[in-house]
Amino acid sequence: MCLFFASGIDIEIGDYSGIGINAHIPNGTIIGDYVMMGPNCFILDENHDISDTTRPMCQQGMTEKKITRIGNDVWIGREVHMTPGRTIADGSVIAMRSVLTKDYPPYSIVGGNPAKLIRYRK
């Protein structure tokens, strides 16, 4: 199994949680209990700063780091990408290859790029 941790010293992974191969998980990420994360998922904790239009983007550095929190009993499909600071609520299902750009209520089923609410678990 191959996991990529940004230094890998400050990540919380709950009981009975599984992480697929090639997951990119930055420091500070909090993963709850009973989480299923598919392979090749990518969690961002920062982004390129592009706010100053008078300077090239490559010279603006990075935005402030934000922590991602994944609740309990969550299923994250393969190749899901999460923008910085996402909170995935308890009981949520994230369809494969989705791009999460915002947070959703508990027991949401979301999918797409950008991810949209499909329905709630019954």
Predicted regions and their residues:
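Glycine-centered loop/turn positions within well-structured domains
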Residues: P106-S108, K116
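Conserved functional loop/turn residues at catalytic and ligand-binding sites
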Residues: K102-D103, P114
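Walker A (P-loop) ATP-phosphate-binding motif of ABC ATPase nucleotide-binding domains
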Residues: Y16, G91, Y107
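Residues that flank catalytic or metal-binding motifs in active/ligand-binding sites
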Residues: P39, M96, P106
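Beta-rich strand-turn-strand
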Residues: R78-V93, S98-K102
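Hydrophobic alpha-helical packing residues
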Residues: I94, V110-G112
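Flexible, glycine/small-residue-enriched loop-and-beta-strand segment within the central core
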Residues: C2-I13, G18-T87, N113-P114, R119-K122
